[in-house]
Amino acid sequence: MGGFFSSIFSSLFGTREMRILILGLDGAGKTTILYRLQVGEVVTTIPTIGFNVETVTYKNLKFQVWDLGGQTSIRPYWRCYYSNTDAVIYVVDSCDRDRIGISKSELVAMLEEEELRKAILVVFANKQDMEQAMTPSEMANALGLPALKDRKWQIFKTSATKGTGLDEAMEWLVETLKSRQ
């Protein structure tokens, strides 16, 4: 009975945790972003084998954030986590010109999945503090983002280590999620 009332309360007042996946190739900065969002500072990370899951509160909204490993051997398992996802933060290393094609292939395959049909897409053009970084518009074109017609998406210039661009990206995500409900 208590569960019934708490679910009514949650639906009326929007206290449900939003489910967000942080995806991208290995070394893009996914785990650094997760912990920067959660604790507000850079923490030492190691390559993610499997996943990290944390609750992040941003602007009074609670997010259950899943950071999935990006190694070639782990990417096929991403689909196991797609169900009930509200948004995908897709992190791309702006300096990794050699693998932008692989990043695009993974993004396209992911967006074709039925379980992610309604998920909002936020692309973090990460490592923008580096001199050789591609611009967000170069990256958007390389990833084929302008061709996405039936998907709410945005790309942001970010640096996980410096913390730049994360607030703007999260602000957009929060507003987009709120307007969708």
Swiss-Prot record:
GO cellular component: cytoplasm; cytosol; Golgi apparatus; Golgi membrane; trans-Golgi network
NCBIfam families linked to this entry: small_GTP (TIGR00231)
Keywords per UniProt: Golgi apparatus, GTP-binding, Lipoprotein, Magnesium, Membrane, Metal-binding, Myristate, Nucleotide-binding
Family to which this protein belongs: Belongs to the small GTPase superfamily. Arf family.
Name used for this protein in its record: ADP-ribosylation factor-like protein 1
Residues annotated to bind GTP: 24-31, 45-48, 70, 126-129, 160-161
SMART domains: ARF, RAB, SAR
Binding site for Mg(2+): 31, 46, 48
Designated gene of the protein: Arl1
Self-association and partners: The GTP-bound form interacts with GOLGA1. The GTP-bound form interacts with GOLGA4 and RGPD8. The GTP-bound form directly interacts with ARFIP2. Binds to SCOC, preferentially in its GTP-bound form. May interact with UNC119. Interacts with ARFIP1; this interaction directs ARFIP1 to the trans-Golgi membranes. Interacts with ARFGEF1 (via N-terminus).
Main localization, broad class: Golgi
Outcome when changing residue 71 to L: Accumulation of GTP-bound form
CDD domains: Arl1
